Amino acid sequence: MGHLTLKDAVFLTITSIVGGGIFVLSPLTYLLFGKSIIWGWALLIFVSLIMASPFAYASTKISESGGVYKFVMKILGREIGVFSAYILWLSGVFALSGVVSFFEIVFNTKFNVSYVGLCLIVILTALILGGLRIVGNFVRIFGILTITIILYIVFSNGIKIDSIGEFNLKNAILTIYFGLWTATGWEGITMPLSAFKNQKAIAYGLLVGTFIIGVLYLLFSLTIVSLNVKTNNLDEILKILIGDNLFLLAGMLLIISSCAFSVLFTLSYMPYGMGKDRIFPKAFIKLRKEIPYYGVILNTLLVIILLIFDAKTLVDMSMFSTLIAYFLLYLAVFKESSGKIKAISLISMLITGLLILFRVYNFIIL
């Protein structure tokens, strides 16, 4: 019987989503699109809440751990559901690998240590295999520290409102596209259903956590723009942001670590759920200390292999596959629901479809 609560759902949403992405992608969007990125990060709050709502709805319609692919399977059929399961799982592994890669990037702004990402994923795996109670305690601690550290970064560097650039539609859309990689991850919170006392806690926690994340990202991006740096080098921006403040560096690394921890935990329930649905071997449904340990180990091994790719490649693979999986979920919710959530799922489906087409167009052109 699970013991995670609504508060844990909020913190798990925050720690699953907030990670190294914001520390790399916010400066990256600034390098690509200049001061006008603020409009994209502001719009991302509303886009995220719209796109998260169908996940909250779907989480109330499934009865066991594994994630929203079970809802897709129920509404759109087994074949599409199995495809959705694989692509959600792989996108999660790509995303987790990207987070670990970001840890290496930030860590090595001050140091030059090889295989530090490998060390991180091994340590986190050991913690998670310690059991659900240990996971719950770490999620709460990491959640509070994540919010506190980002606010510290913002207020210690300051915000200058006059640094905001003019609105540019193309730049705003591209900022939203890149920003969504570090703002999405709602599928993760729906995976460990059996770990929660109350199933509705997942839906409420997902939406509250998403709003908090959007505000934190906007504040952080305002700080990046306010620095007004004159460089085209991402590492230089990070060095200016961190300075000689080792406490700040440690805080950023802690946030990235907490994200990797939460994603590795929630993602372990995908092989578990797929084992229940006979997509994966039955061995994956075995639990130890309420943790699907074979799922944890499998995901860890895949991350270690994927670390051969650079962060940008991992981000692109993760974001594109995630958008496809999200499109299928929105289609399923649209088909099954009625009223406001039907309209919201349609809007989400259109946003996701446009982002997919926009990315394909840019890939072909570039």
UniProtKB/Swiss-Prot annotation:
The question of whether Cell membrane is a record keyword is answered with: yes
Which spans of this chain does the record mark as coiled coil?
A: none
Give the UniProt family note.
Belongs to the amino acid-polyamine-organocation (APC) superfamily.
Chief location of this protein? membrane
Q: Per its record, how is this protein called by name?
A: Putative amino-acid transporter MJ1196
Q: Which UniProt keywords apply?
A: Amino-acid transport, Cell membrane, Membrane, Transmembrane, Transmembrane helix, Transport
One of its Pfam families is AA_permease_2
> Does the keyword Cell membrane feature in the UniProt annotation?
yes
PANTHER family to which the protein is assigned, alphabetical: AMINO ACID TRANSPORTER-RELATED (PTHR42770), INNER MEMBRANE TRANSPORT PROTEIN YBAT (PTHR42770:SF11)
Extract the InterPro entries matched here: AA/rel_permease1 (IPR002293), APC_superfamily (IPR050367), Na/Ala_symport (IPR001463)
GO CC, sorted alphabetically, is: plasma membrane
Q: What membrane topology was assigned to this protein in its record? A: Multi-pass membrane protein
Q: Which organism is it from?
A: Methanocaldococcus jannaschii (strain ATCC 43067 / DSM 2661 / JAL-1 / JCM 10045 / NBRC 100440)
Molecular functions per Gene Ontology:
amino acid:sodium symporter activity
Residue intervals passing through the bilayer? 14-34, 37-57, 87-107, 111-131, 141-161, 173-193, 205-225, 247-267, 291-311, 314-334, 346-366
- State the source organism's domain of life: Archaea
Q: Where in the cell is it found?
A: Cell membrane
